[in-house]
C-alpha cells in the first residue's frame, strides 16, 4: 500500500530500510488498515475526528466514523444541539421495515433512516437478517464481526431515548 503512495518520492528500499532502523515511523492506523480497507475509504487512516451535534445526520456520521476505527469527539453545546429538530409528542409504530445491509455503510444508513422516521413520529421495525453472525471473519477490514446484537441494542436505545424525550429536543 505505502509503496503505491510514495512512488517517485522515496525509493522503496530506502523507505523500508528507514522503517526497519526506526528512523521513521509510519502511521500505525495506516499500517493496520493498509490495503483494500484504506483504499476504499481513508477514514480508517485517522486516529480521531470532531463534529458538532447540530443536525440529525451527526449521529449516523459519527457511527460510520467509529465503525471505521476512528475516534469521534463531539460538542453538544447549546448553540449546536438547539439546531436539532423537536421530537414529536407522539411516536407511533408503523409498518415500515428498515432493511439493514451488512456493511459499515449499511449500518450507518439504517441508523439515519431510523432517526429520520423517529423525527417524523414513526417507530419502524428493522430487519438485520443480512448481517453476518458474530465471529464471522471481516474480509476487507480484518477482524471478526460483532453480529447484529450491538446494532439492535443501539436501535432500541435510540427509540427509547426518543420516547423519553418526546415533545422536546434532545439535549
Residue ranges and their predicted role:
Residues 1-171:
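Extended catalytic cores of very large enzyme megasubunits
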Amino acid at each position: 500500500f505505502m509503496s503505491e503512495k510514495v512512488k517517485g518520492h522515496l525509493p522503496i528500499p530506502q523507505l523500508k530500510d528507514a522503517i526497519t532502523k526506526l528512523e521513521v515511523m509510519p502511521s500505525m492506523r495506516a499500517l493496520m488498515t493498509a490495503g483494500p480497507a484504506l483504499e476504499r475509504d481513508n477514514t480508517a487512516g485517522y486516529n480521531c475526528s470532531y463534529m458538532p451535534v447540530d443536525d440529525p445526520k451527526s449521529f449516523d456520521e459519527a457511527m460510520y466514523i467509529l465503525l471505521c476505527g476512528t475516534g469521534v469527539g463531539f460538542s453538544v453545546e447549546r448553540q449546536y444541539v438547539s439546531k436539532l429538530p423537536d421530537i414529536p409528542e407522539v411516536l407511533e409504530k408503523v409498518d415500515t421495515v428498515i432493511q439493514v445491509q451488512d456493511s459499515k455503510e449499511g449500518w450507518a444508513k439504517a441508523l439515519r433512516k431510523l432517526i429520520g422516521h423517529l423525527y417524523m413520529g414513526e417507530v419502524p421495525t428493522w430487519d438485520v437478517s443480512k448481517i453476518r453472525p458474530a465471529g464471522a471473519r471481516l474480509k476487507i477490514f480484518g477482524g471478526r464481526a460483532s453480529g447484529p446484537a450491538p446494532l439492535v441494542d443501539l436501535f432500541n436505545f435510540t427509540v427509547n431515548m426518543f420516547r423519553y424525550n418526546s415533545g422536546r429536543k434532545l439535549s
